[in-house]
């Protein structure tokens, strides 16, 4: 089905539910707007109505209008959803409100992925390090869009502090976005442009994870931070932001949390004191126990079946 651009979101959804059914379930991933989605779904007799939370902030300014909107959407979600899901406890509480986990309708459903795909690969490590001349370097890695949320401005300052203590340090950034040129210019201003690699978007991210020695991710907010889980599956220690990144992300015991407001030198110390990366696959097995895509898919199917009163 497609949505007619001349209709509103509400009109399009109502039209699809009315003319395209019957539907057994509506599973909404549009944050607070899920309040509208599950309300329309209930009005059209959809028996299973799921609201799913994926973040802990949007970086928005909290005006009175915004607070009123979120209050109303929460009311609609609680009144009309049959199940509340989130990628972390923090994400659930951000969208559904504090104390939501006490309700039997609310639970965490991890973002499953093919964990085996992200295992450490010695050949991939050698190839990427050779491609960029990193054979003898201490490689600090980062994977993320060059947008405000990922906080590259502080990342580059933190790496400058690392450079002051590790002459062999190199920063390997995977991703692209609207702030890339600004961050590239900032690296030149800090005098470290020759020690920063902007690799752009890459399809073979496991090889890039394998090329890294530690993972630095000072994000401003995250529902979970999937790249942090991928990096741990690859055997990396991850250094990320205290409070705004959920503690759920520490799957392997290889996550260190630093306050966002801490000076760059504090972040540098966390990176430089991080345990050496693993290469034997133990971390991948630990991650797989929670995030294996097949297991997560089976859990979601079980939720659908339970909500529908059983599957045939």
Regions flagged by a language model, labelled:
Residues 13-14, 119-133:
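A short helix/loop element that forms part of the nucleotide-sugar donor recognition site in Leloir-type
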Residues 138, 142-161, 178-184:
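A conserved mid-protein helix/loop that constitutes part of the nucleotide-sugar donor-binding site
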Residues 278-312:
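A charged, aromatic-enriched C-terminal amphipathic alpha-helix characteristic of glycosyltransferases
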Residues 201, 220:
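Aromatic "clamp/platform" in nucleotide-sugar-dependent glycosyltransferases that forms part
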Residues 79-119:
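A short, active-site helix/loop in glycosyltransferases that binds the activated sugar's phosphate group
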Residues 228, 237-241, 247:
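Short hydrophobic beta-strand element within catalytic cores of glycosyltransferases
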Residues 28-34, 53:
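Short His-centered aromatic/hydrophobic patch
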């Amino acid at each position: 089905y497609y949505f007619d651009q001349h209709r509103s979101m509400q009109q399009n959804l109502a039209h699809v539910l009315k003319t395209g059914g019957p539907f057994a379930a509506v599973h909404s991933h549009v944050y607070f707007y899920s309040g509208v989605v599950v309300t329309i779904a209930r009005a059209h007799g959809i028996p299973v109505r799921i609201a799913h939370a994926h973040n802990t902030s949007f970086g928005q300014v909290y005006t009175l209008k915004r607070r009123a909107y979120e209050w109303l959407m929460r009311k609609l979600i609680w009144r009309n959803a049959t199940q509340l899901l989130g990628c972390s406890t923090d994400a659930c509480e951000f969208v559904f409100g504090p104390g939501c986990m006490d309700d039997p309708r609310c639970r965490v459903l991890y973002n499953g992925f093919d964990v085996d795909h992200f295992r450490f690969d010695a050949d991939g490590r050698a190839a990427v390090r050779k491609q960029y001349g990193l054979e003898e370097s201490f490689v600090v890695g980062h994977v993320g869009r060059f947008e405000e949320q990922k906080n590259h401005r502080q990342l580059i300052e933190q790496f400058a502090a690392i450079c002051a203590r590790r002459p062999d340090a190199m920063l390997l950034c995977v991703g692209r976005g609207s702030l890339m040129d600004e961050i590239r210019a900032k690296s030149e201003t800090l005098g470290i442009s020759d020690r920063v690699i902007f690799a752009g978007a890459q399809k073979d991210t496991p090889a890039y994870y394998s090329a890294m020695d530690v993972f630095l991710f000072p994000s401003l907010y995250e529902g979970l931070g999937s790249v942090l889980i991928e990096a741990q599956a690859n055997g990396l220690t991850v250094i990320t932001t205290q409070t705004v990144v959920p503690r759920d992300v520490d799957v392997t015991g290889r996550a260190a949390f630093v306050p966002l407001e801490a000076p760059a030198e504090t972040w540098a110390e966390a990176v430089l004191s991080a345990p050496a990366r693993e290469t034997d696959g133990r971390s991948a097995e630990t991650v797989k126990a929670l995030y294996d895509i097949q297991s997560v898919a089976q859990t979601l199917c079980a939720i659908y079946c339970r909500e529908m009163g059983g599957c045939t």
